[in-house]
Design a protein with these regions (language model features):
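A structural signal for well-ordered alpha-helices, especially hydrophobic packing surfaces
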Residues: 60-63, 86-93, 113, 117
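Flexible helix-coil transition and linker loops at the boundaries of alpha-helical arrays
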Residues: 68-72, 116-119
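Short, charge-rich amphipathic alpha-helical segments embedded
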Residues: 72, 76-104
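Long, non-catalytic architectural segments outside compact domain cores
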Residues: 1-48
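Residue signature of alpha-solenoid helical repeat architecture, marking inter-repeat boundaries
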Residues: 27-28, 46-54, 72-73, 77-80
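N-terminal cap/lid segment of alpha/beta-hydrolase-fold proteins
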Residues: 52, 106-131
């Protein structure tokens, strides 16, 4: 059996495998992961960040389109994927040309996740834990 690697960079490879392994849980789609990985320059944190954020933005637009047409299930699943892709981008934001984007990236992830939860078939409660 032949093995396949997306990247020679072990950190990139590990996170790409996590993204790929999220597909059965509707947190990614195999084709989206492959297409994103194909655009990333191996070992370049800026490239990693930019490409995953671009995928998150594209999938978010899909979610919003589905939501506007009343396709709640597809919208929810797309918002979950967008949230996961922003979280995947977040891992390397500190290795980019502008690490100050970390807060915006986290908020993007959280916004998409919260939008998915609003479309969940059972009630979901937001809980704040003060610490």
């Amino acid at each position: 059996m032949t093995s396949h690697r997306f990247f020679t960079d072990d950190g990139f490879e590990f996170l790409a495998m996590i993204a790929l392994g999220s597909a059965p849980y509707r947190l990614s789609e195999v084709g989206e992961v492959y297409a994103t990985a194909d655009r990333i320059t191996d070992g370049d944190g800026e490239s990693w960040f930019e490409e995953w954020m671009a995928t998150a933005a594209r999938v978010r637009r899909i979610a919003e389109d589905c939501e506007s047409r009343g396709d709640v299930v597809s919208a929810r699943d797309a918002f979950l994927r967008a949230a996961n892709y922003a979280a995947t981008a977040f891992f390397y934001v500190l290795a980019t040309d502008d690490p100050s984007r970390s807060l915006h990236t986290w908020r993007s992830h959280r916004r998409d996740f919260d939008r998915a939860m609003k479309l969940w078939p059972t009630p979901v409660s937001h809980v704040e834990i003060p610490y």
